[in-house]
Amino acid sequence: LAKKYGVKLLIDSARFAENAYFIKTREAGYADKSIIDICREIYSHADYMTMSAKKDGIVNIGGFLGFKDEKDMQKCQMYSIMFEGYLTYGGMAGRDMNALAQGLRESMEFDYLETRIKQVAYLASKLDEYGIPYQRPAGGHAIFVDAKKILTNVPKEEFQAQTLAIELYLEAGIRGVEIGALLADRDPDTKENRYPRLELLRLAIPRRVYTNNHMDYIAAALKNVYDRRESITSG
């Protein structure tokens, strides 16, 4: 479609490996292809890529841009020098670049991806067991709990997802993030709150940190909040 209209295609690559895993496991014709081969096919269609390395780069900092056309790269080079650092490092320390190179390799290992994504699926199965609503199907990096369906007694003006995030933290010290009216921010012209259709609590699962016992703990804490949801009437 982009080629038809002469539009260059940019791929946000933050979770490229997780997406490749889902292509392999869910799309017909890809079951026997390796993750790296699927990634090659994805990027064969792209003109540019952006990469936040803190996601599928499995590092704590950094990122990069990729270009198919060297002329496009040259146009951006001066901005790297002005705002980030020289072209060979772009403001990143050598240690971080080495870690990123290794992280990109490891992120495309099928066993690593399956372990990570199945841990998220395990948490989803526990929420199913407790009847806690969330966005289905579960994704690769997080569970998005449906705060609007849980905190029905909290007015939307008092931020249901943020309220659920606070209740979960008070219950068990678990930090999630609100994806709702606070994130949407106020209308720049009217200064009124903007209320999106969904009010979600995102529980993003760090890589190579937690066991399924921790997922049990998260689910049990959410159940405790869910069981007393009728008593939560304000944000």
Question: Model-derived features: where do they sit?
Answer:
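Conserved PLP-enzyme active-site core in the AAT-like
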Residues: L1-I132, P155
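Structural preference for beta-strand elements that scaffold enzyme active sites
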Residues: K8-L10, Y48, A142, G176, ...
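Short, glycine-/Ser/Thr-/acidic-enriched flexible segments
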Residues: K55-D56, D69-D72, R105-S107, G140-H141, ...
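Short, conserved charged micro-motifs
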Residues: M73-Q74, T152-Q160, R208-Y217
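PLP-dependent enzyme catalytic core of the Aspartate aminotransferase-like
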Residues: S107, E171, L183-G235
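Conserved glycine-rich beta-strand-loop-beta hairpin in the small C-terminal domain of fold type I
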Residues: Q119-A121, Q135-A147
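Active-site loop ensemble at the mouth of alpha/beta enzyme cores that anchors a bound cofactor
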Residues: K148-R175, D189-P196
